[in-house]
Amino acid sequence: MANLPPVYIVSTARTPIGSFLGSLSSQTAVQLGSVAIKGAVERAGIKPEDVDEVFFGNVLSAGVGQGPARQCALGAGLPQTVIATTVNKVCASSLKAIILGAQNIMLGTSDIVVAGGTESMSNTPHYLPNLRNGAKYGDQTLVDGVLKDGLTDSFKKDHMGISAELCVDDHDLTREAQDEYAINSYKKAQAATEAGLFTEIVPVEIPGGRGKPAIKVERDDEVKNLNVDKLKAMRPAFKPDGTVTAPNAAPINDGAAAVVLVSEAKLKELNLKPVAKILGWGDAEREPERFTIAPALAIPKAIKHAGLTAEQVEYYEINEAFSAVALANMKILGLNPDQVNVYGGSVAIGHPLGCSGARIVTTLTSVLKERKAKIGAVGICNGGGGASAMVIENLQ
């Protein structure tokens, strides 16, 4: 990227991650996205009218209404002139949104872009297929939108967990290794939470109703839920003889995350303080059923695009769609576990599909600041066979 104009991250913000039907389930994807965008804009020290464009991820858009990104932008108080585009690259949606935002600034189309993503899996509806033709005779079956559009391979019609089991077989991962990884993810997330290290979080206020005071949600729901004995005793979730279980996989969640991106000219003009500089990115695709290890292709592409070597990357955030995903990609890339997901990952924190790519960017900026490190990389797989990755430089 030596010949391309630099792009800076000047703020990060994410909501706490709510459990399925948990603390944030009363809030729509739009409401959560609006909170994240508003928080990011306020932290950046810019005015709402300074924002040129919004790229925002959302996967489970049924019932959300037209243009989720546009709704989130206006809900956050951005002006009606702001351009907004919704991105659906499954789990990588919000990281791809950040990549698109950076590219937009590099092309000179915009100077200030808000990018990220949102998801309320709790509010995803069930579908009644073919009802438009009339229910002529017999039962009508409801289709779960979370499964249909979020967690099922479109080609083989298998649950994502079947792909995780294939990953386990391909890379000789044991049940014990997956369980131990999940336990460590929870413990790291618990330690980071208690130490106040998730500085990217902005609280969500839930109206109390009937004269009751509003409830302020400030912590991730799932982090506290570790039960080691129960985790180790859990039955396989996807195959009778499998090793992937509910607790060694990411849960179903609600949440949103956003970053503010600016050009160098606007950074200087408005005297903004950069959080990080985007150094490079990469996307990759492979067989749909092996999407789990696509980050091992995308991350090296991002590092090469940044003009760096793997040895220069100090910390990684690899999205834990399953414990097996993190284990396999670390194995392929030869990474030291002490470098990866040091505040825990999505197994413990949660995985709202359209939010997670941006969530791991916000967490990485917190890690790099606290550890006084310079270079970090993120990678996230997505259903269909893909992954996206990004490399950033800490400027805090």
From Swiss-Prot:
PROSITE patterns: THIOLASE_1, THIOLASE_2, THIOLASE_3. Pathway: Metabolic intermediate biosynthesis; (R)-mevalonate biosynthesis; (R)-mevalonate from acetyl-CoA: step 1/3. Transmembrane segments: none annotated. Induction: Expression is regulated by the Zn(2)-C6 fungal-type transcription factor FgSR which binds directly to the promoter. Acetyl-CoA acetyltransferase; part of the first module of ergosterol biosynthesis pathway that includes the early steps of the pathway, conserved across all eukaryotes, and which results in the formation of mevalonate from acetyl-coenzyme A (acetyl-CoA). ERG10B catalyzes the formation of acetoacetyl-CoA from acetyl-CoA. The first module starts with the action of the cytosolic acetyl-CoA acetyltransferase ERG10B that catalyzes the formation of acetoacetyl-CoA. The hydroxymethylglutaryl-CoA synthases ERG13 then condenses acetyl-CoA with acetoacetyl-CoA to form HMG-CoA. The active site is at C91, H351, C381. Belongs to the thiolase-like superfamily. Thiolase family. CoA binds at N227, K230. PANTHER family: ACETYL-COA ACETYLTRANSFERASE, ACETYL-COA C-ACYLTRANSFERASE. It catalyses: 2 acetyl-CoA = acetoacetyl-CoA + CoA. One of its GO terms (cellular component) is cytosol. Homotetramer. The gene is ERG10. It is an enzyme of class 2 (transferase). One of its GO terms (molecular function) is metal ion binding. Its EC number is 2.3.1.9. It comes from Gibberella zeae (strain ATCC MYA-4620 / CBS 123657 / FGSC 9075 / NRRL 31084 / PH-1) (Wheat head blight fungus). This is Acetyl-CoA acetyltransferase ERG10, cytosolic. One of its GO terms (biological process) is ergosterol biosynthetic process. The keyword Nucleotidyltransferase does not apply. Its main location: cytoplasm.
